[in-house]
């Protein structure tokens, strides 16, 4: 099963299955001298962890174990291997799925490609979103390394089901959304999202949503003009996330309804620099980052595992039947998915930053390491619960 690695210079390989002993990641290409601790990784993992309000009831501790690549809280330049053990597995929930592939899931395509006898039906196996633990671990490393360029990445849930954000949002509000149980950047929206989740849970159903990720101060010129355009690289990265069904940046599909005179973003002087008036392009022009905020959005489909009975085929007799999926599943995968999107944006940007020479390939100086650590600590402090002013 190829296709488990991402990146060229900052190369990430994830491994493990939903109900296997562990999931994990190997990160190759991290320069030496980057300050890095288990706590740095846990900070990001906490926001995709199950067992919290409004997400999957699977109570995983998600404690990362660093196996290699770090000594005295600094990277050594060798591959970083990290595992997270699966400690709350109930495979008995999936016995029915063994013979009845779930609508909306990868079950049947996996059986068709790899063979029924080779299919790990427990929790979705390799196709499970549990795989994204490795992405978030690598994303934490990438986010910290990007602090060398003072590049910050944060996301929020722009819509959930029929409810959506219809006003401007500040980057500070997006940072604060990390502590919202439904990743809302506004209190009033949080209440609407919570009501929807409660409704879906009662009905045995689920909702989809749109995640938006904003990158502040991205290095200028990341990406390559032809096949490795930044928009193409981000699209591939984000579309590889389980349950993601669409991608856009800047004005996205809305631009198709506009005139050129409306869609063209005028070039102006801004803070004594050359810039763009509205950032309609979402920080990417000609396949290159232009220094404006990098703004991407992606659509998550509703969670496929739902209690409502749905038609399927019993593989034992090839007769039509019904399945009602039991177990512990997210009523909206988009909530925890926001952190995964942030991670994939970080992995894409850090790889291109290294390719462009913005981040050193071999090692960080002691001064650079100290700068990274100071900025990381400021980032962690900035991610705080919403204030009453956001009501």
UniProtKB/Swiss-Prot annotation:
One Gene Ontology term of the biological-process aspect is:
aromatic amino acid family biosynthetic process
Checking NCBIfam families in the record gives: aroC (TIGR00033), PRK05382.1 (NF003793)
Q: Which family does it belong to?
A: Belongs to the chorismate synthase family.
Q: Provide the protein name.
A: Chorismate synthase
- List the pathway annotation: Metabolic intermediate biosynthesis; chorismate biosynthesis; chorismate from D-erythrose 4-phosphate and phosphoenolpyruvate: step 7/7
GO terms for cellular component:
cytosol
Q: Which organism is it from?
A: Saccharolobus islandicus (strain Y.N.15.51 / Yellowstone #2)
Give residues annotated as binding FMN: 126-128, 286, 301-305, 328
Reactions that this protein is recorded to catalyse: 5-O-(1-carboxyvinyl)-3-phosphoshikimate = chorismate + phosphate
| Residues noted as binding NADP(+) in the record, renumbered to the chain | 48
Q: Which gene encodes it?
A: aroC
As cofactor, the record names: FMNH2
Q: Does the keyword Flavoprotein apply?
A: yes
What enzyme category does the UniProt record give? lyase
Keywords per UniProt: Amino-acid biosynthesis, Aromatic amino acid biosynthesis, FAD, Flavoprotein, FMN, Lyase, NADP
């Amino acid at each position: 099963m190829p296709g488990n690695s991402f990146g060229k210079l900052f190369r990430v390989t994830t491994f493990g299955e939903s109900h296997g002993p562990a999931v994990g990641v190997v990160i190759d290409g991290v320069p030496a001298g980057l300050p890095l601790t288990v706590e740095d990784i846990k900070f990001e993992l906490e926001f995709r962890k199950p067992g919290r309000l409004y997400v999957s009831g699977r109570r995983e501790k998600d404690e990362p174990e660093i196996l290699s690549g770090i000594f005295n809280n600094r990277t050594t330049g060798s591959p970083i291997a990290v595992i997270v053990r699966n400690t709350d597995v109930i495979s008995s929930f999936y016995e029915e799925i063994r013979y009845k592939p779930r609508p909306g899931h990868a079950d049947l395509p996996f059986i068709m490609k790899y063979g029924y006898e080779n299919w790990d039906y427990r929790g979705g196996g390799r196709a499970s979103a549990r795989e994204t633990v490795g992405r978030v671990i690598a994303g934490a490393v990438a986010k910290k390394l990007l602090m060398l360029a003072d590049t910050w990445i944060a996301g929020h849930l722009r819509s959930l089901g029929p409810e959506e954000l219809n006003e401007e949002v500040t980057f500070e509000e997006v940072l604060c959304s990390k502590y919202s149980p439904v990743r809302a950047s506004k209190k009033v929206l949080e209440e609407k999202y919570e009501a929807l989740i409660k409704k879906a849970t009662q009905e045995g159903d689920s909702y989809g949503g749109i995640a938006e990720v904003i990158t502040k101060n991205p290095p200028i010129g990341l990406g390559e003009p032809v096949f490795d355009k930044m928009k193409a690289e981000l699209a591939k990265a984000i579309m590889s996330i389980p349950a993601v069904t669409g991608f856009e940046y800047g004005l996205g599909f809305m631009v198709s309804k506009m005139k050129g005179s409306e869609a063209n973003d005028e070039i102006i002087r801004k803070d004594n620099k050359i810039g763009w008036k509205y950032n309609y392009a979402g920080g990417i022009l000609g396949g290159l980052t232009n220094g404006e905020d990098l703004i991407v959005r992606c659509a998550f489909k509703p969670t496929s595992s739902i209690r409502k009975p749905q038609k399927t085929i019993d593989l034992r007799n090839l007769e039509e039947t019904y399945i009602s999926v039991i177990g512990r599943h997210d009523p909206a995968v988009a909530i925890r998915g926001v952190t995964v999107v942030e991670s994939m944006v970080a992995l894409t940007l850090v790889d291109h930053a290294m390719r462009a020479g913005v981040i050193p390939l071999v090692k960080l100086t002691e001064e650079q390491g100290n700068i990274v650590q100071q900025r990381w600590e400021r980032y962690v402090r900035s991610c705080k619960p919403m204030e009453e002013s956001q009501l």
